[in-house]
């Protein structure tokens, strides 16, 4: 399990990339099956009690992370692109069916799952509308939090049959 974090490929992007010793379909399953996503999505000791995924362009995603103190952090969004086993793109710019705009869009996430040797080159590119939003996300702990989650994702995907 090796990780590399690339901070700014563009002035508004944050990027995490790593090799996962599991086939792309297994890494994709961990992102696309609610019961699997709940097992790794939040950095421990946080949990993910809710994962509702309508995995199609225009489909709604509703994920809730719960902190150790019981505080819920809802994450709502819409899928923009779904290419099974290869690519997922979603955004929080919309929060429900009918393309209802969010009050404060923050990011669009582009996930790629590329076959590499005996595993997957996993890349999460998180695009922000402004440099200030990217900086806010960085200061919130993007690198540490997303790296922890990528480790949890890898452990789960590598154990899938």
Predicted segment positions?
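Short, flexible helix/strand-to-coil boundary loops that buttress conserved ligand/catalytic motifs
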Residues: 31, 41, 92, 150, ...
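Hydrophobic-ligand binding "helix-grip"
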Residues: 38, 42-43, 49-57, 62, ...
């Amino acid at each position: 399990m090796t990780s590399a974090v690339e901070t700014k490929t563009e002035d508004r992007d944050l990027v995490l990339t790593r090799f996962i010793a599991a086939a792309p379909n297994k890494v994709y399953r961990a992102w696309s099956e609610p019961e699997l996503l709940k097992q790794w999505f939040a950095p421990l000791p946080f949990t993910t009690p809710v994962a509702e995924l309508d995995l199609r362009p225009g489909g709604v995603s509703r994920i809730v992370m719960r902190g150790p103190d019981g505080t819920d952090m809802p994450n709502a969004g819409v899928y923009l692109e779904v290419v099974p086993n290869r690519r997922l793109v979603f955004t929080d710019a919309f929060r429900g069916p009918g393309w209802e705009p969010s009050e404060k869009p923050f990011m669009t996430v582009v996930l790629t799952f590329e076959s590499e040797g005996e595993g997957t080159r996993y890349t999460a590119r998180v695009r922000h509308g402004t440099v200030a939003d990217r900086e806010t996300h960085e200061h919130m702990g993007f690198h540490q939090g997303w790296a922890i989650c990528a480790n949890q994702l890898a452990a789960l995907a590598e154990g899938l049959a």
